[in-house]
Curated annotation (Swiss-Prot):
Species per Swiss-Prot/TrEMBL record: Rattus norvegicus (Rat)
Residues recorded as bearing N6-acetyllysine in the entry: 21, 32, 37, 44
Name of protein: ATP synthase F(1) complex subunit epsilon, mitochondrial
Gene assigned in the entry: Atp5f1e
Localization per Swiss-Prot or TrEMBL: Mitochondrion; Mitochondrion inner membrane
Annotated function: Subunit epsilon, of the mitochondrial membrane ATP synthase complex (F(1)F(0) ATP synthase or Complex V) that produces ATP from ADP in the presence of a proton gradient across the membrane which is generated by electron transport complexes of the respiratory chain. ATP synthase complex consist of a soluble F(1) head domain - the catalytic core - and a membrane F(1) domain - the membrane proton channel. These two domains are linked by a central stalk rotating inside the F(1) region and a stationary peripheral stalk.
Length: 51
């Protein structure tokens, strides 16, 4: 059995992005602001100091 998202030619990452957007769009107005804050991507890089 092949997953539906695979049959549609999507990767799992793209499928999960589409699902997350659909859930955020379906939220009530009072919860949308918090969901939009957490939907962004953030990366932190740390340089290792050699001693």
């Amino acid at each position: 059995m092949v997953a539906y998202w695979r049959q549609a030619g999507l990767s799992y990452i793209r499928f999960s992005q589409i699902c997350a957007k659909a859930v955020r769009d379906a939220l009530k107005t009072e919860f949308k602001a918090n969901a939009e804050k957490t939907s962004g991507t953030s990366i932190k890089t740390v340089k290792i100091k050699k001693e």
